[in-house]
């Protein structure tokens, strides 16, 4: 055992979170260090998605702290939160692809939002990421033209577009084929 483990990538301390006055998670604490993988497993309605929403800032915790790379996300101001958000990708349970946009446009969204890359550079990254997830040549397809597994892979390509240090998955295997 390493007496001096690396600093956590994610550190959650005494986190309580929920909706309105309903507490869903209470006093949750954990740390994830570089190269570690954390799976949150539990029954339907136990708070897995609520935890994800708290971790990525979609829900404000009732108490506690979420820190990334030693920087408090919970206490951060808007510019600091934006910088922290650039370090992770998220794949939602429903994949959250914009139905009116092609796959190329969907995957390009984080690149347009968080970088000043040229259109040609963004297109190159989009093509690479779609190829990496087995969707080469599908740039001009719309989400309605895809199977559930293909939508999940397109969402993965978008989550990986910025080469994030952390990737969050909500129901990661839902809709995936056993071979992919």
Kindly give the residue locations of the regions a language model identified:
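Conserved ABC ATPase "signature" region
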Residues: 72, 119-137
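A short, proline-enriched helix->beta-strand linker immediately N-terminal to the Walker B motif
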Residues: 161-165
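Conserved ABC ATPase signature
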Residues: 142-146, 150
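Catalytic Walker B motif of ABC-type/P-loop ATPase nucleotide-binding domains
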Residues: 167-170
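Helix-to-loop junction immediately C-terminal to a conserved catalytic motif
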Residues: 56
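Conserved ABC transporter NBD signature motif
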Residues: 64-73
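ABC ATPase NBD coupling module
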Residues: 73-89, 119
